[in-house]
């Protein structure tokens, strides 16, 4: 049987994928045509960070009070999974290294690197917000 400390964070991360895809579609088809890419990028990044916070909030409620090391490990796992997913999808779709690395630069107001920092920090931050007595 899979431990809840492994299962629930993995399922939570998997729910972030469709949220991120929907966010990308919103940016490409609604925000960018209306506001331009330089405005759409930070709006989209902020919306994705809010969605990730909501998922982390629900995860903290599901797993309850755990040691801070658990929340830090969950954030690290989410970070590694996200970067691996991004590069895996890029490689399978035939993108070059330059194309895959482009989102990791702050160009056209892109805040993807900040989103990745938030992916890593969100479980611990939301654990502290939701359960301030975590050891």
Predicted regions and their residues:
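Transmembrane alpha-helical segments of integral membrane proteins
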Residues: 55-57, 85-100
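Core segments of alpha-helical transmembrane spans in multipass integral membrane proteins
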Residues: 19-20, 39-61, 78, 114
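N-terminal signal-anchor transmembrane alpha-helix
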Residues: 1-32
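Internal alpha-helical transmembrane segments of multi-pass membrane proteins
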Residues: 37-42, 64-80
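Individual transmembrane alpha-helices with interfacial aromatic-anchor signatures
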Residues: 102-119
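Hydrophobic alpha-helical transmembrane segments
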Residues: 6-10, 14, 42-46, 71-76, ...
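Membrane-water interface at the C-terminal end of transmembrane alpha helices
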Residues: 114-135
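Membrane-interface helix termini and inter-helical loops of multi-pass transporters
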Residues: 26-35, 94-104
